[in-house]
């Protein structure tokens, strides 16, 4: 079977570049995002499947992996790309917004990694990458 990648938190920034790179290397691409309607162009460009997923919701993540299992089996690579930008100085950041950002970047990453690792360990193969989304490569991060 062809090598495959699941990109969680897909959009038109860093994850789009990664999707194109993986496609160019012959990998089957699956894109996951809260709003898959925004992925129409990327889906077409990469021949990807898309799955709706809120990475901070246990049931949504479990559903993502059940659907991924049916489409590509256990992915060779899972990329966790969601982020939530806060901006501003630490003294000005709303604590509720900070909690939301931590939920997306940390807890969501844990949920995705847990589901991916369970499958990858059984197959004795696979990699999980965590990005900082596009914010990690721009000056405002």
Please place each PLM-identified region on the residue numbering.
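Conserved glycine-rich cofactor-binding loop
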Residues: 11-12
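Conserved NAD(P)H cofactor-binding loop of Rossmann-fold oxidoreductase domains
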Residues: 79-87
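Catalytic loop of short-chain dehydrogenase/reductase
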Residues: 127-141
